[in-house]
């Protein structure tokens, strides 16, 4: 479970790659908000994506929210997971881990908002290092040998063609560096 945000999803990619290397025949499912699903790696790294639509959920009344959770519980139970890994470590991910039907639940060391009551926190030797290393500590706990940090990005060939077509259409040539000077939170704009 790693539902958001963009940077957090990208930081989790090396964990997903290490998990796939450790368990090459496992079926690995990722639970994510739909707006970030395009950054979840394609097969063979991730086999299936389950969506939790936070935008839609936040617009629901209480009864509709309960129905949404009942449906999500049914879906998660139907998967019969052997292990649930909560890489989000927040209340919302803890609830989803709890209703998954899987009793074997772990998460990375920095679990907050009560998520540590639902899943076992896995802390490794990189607790003071970059979050990527802290996520990889969970993979190491599961027996992965992390020799290099890999970022299994999804196939972006269609997007590449689209950008190339737009550059040609606008008669722009050469190499470019694209800068997106923005952030979702004001505190992250510097």
Please state what every model-predicted region is.
Residues 1-190:
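Catalytic machinery of carbohydrate-active enzymes
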